[in-house]
């Protein structure tokens, strides 16, 4: 069960970081 908890926390952290960067700095792949 601990492995599942670790994966869940890591996934939540990665998603939070991704959204924070995406909302703070708009994606640049749209306009090359």
UniProtKB/Swiss-Prot annotation:
Give the UniProt keywords, A-Z.
Membrane, Photosynthesis, Photosystem II, Thylakoid, Transmembrane, Transmembrane helix
Disulfide bridge map: none
- Keyword Lipid biosynthesis assigned: no
Domain of life per record = Bacteria
Q: Subcellular localization, per the record?
A: Cellular thylakoid membrane
Query: For this chain's UniProt record, which GO biological process terms are given?
Result: photosynthesis
Bilayer topology annotation: Single-pass membrane protein
Looking at the UniProt record for this protein, which Gene Ontology cellular component terms does it annotate, in alphabetical order? photosystem II reaction center; plasma membrane-derived thylakoid membrane
Question: Primary place of residence?
Answer: membrane
Q: Does the keyword Transmembrane apply?
A: yes
Q: Which residues cross the membrane?
A: 3-23
What InterPro entries does this protein's entry cite?
Answer: PSII_PsbT, PSII_PsbT_sf
Q: How does it assemble?
A: PSII is composed of 1 copy each of membrane proteins PsbA, PsbB, PsbC, PsbD, PsbE, PsbF, PsbH, PsbI, PsbJ, PsbK, PsbL, PsbM, PsbT, PsbX, PsbY, Psb30/Ycf12, peripheral proteins PsbO, CyanoQ (PsbQ), PsbU, PsbV and a large number of cofactors. It forms dimeric complexes.
- Report the sequence similarity comment from the record: Belongs to the PsbT family.
What does this protein's UniProt record list under function?
A: Found at the monomer-monomer interface of the photosystem II (PS II) dimer, plays a role in assembly and dimerization of PSII. PSII is a light-driven water plastoquinone oxidoreductase, using light energy to abstract electrons from H(2)O, generating a proton gradient subsequently used for ATP formation.
Protein name (record): Photosystem II reaction center protein T
Source species, please? Prochlorococcus marinus (strain MIT 9301)
Q: Which gene encodes it?
A: psbT
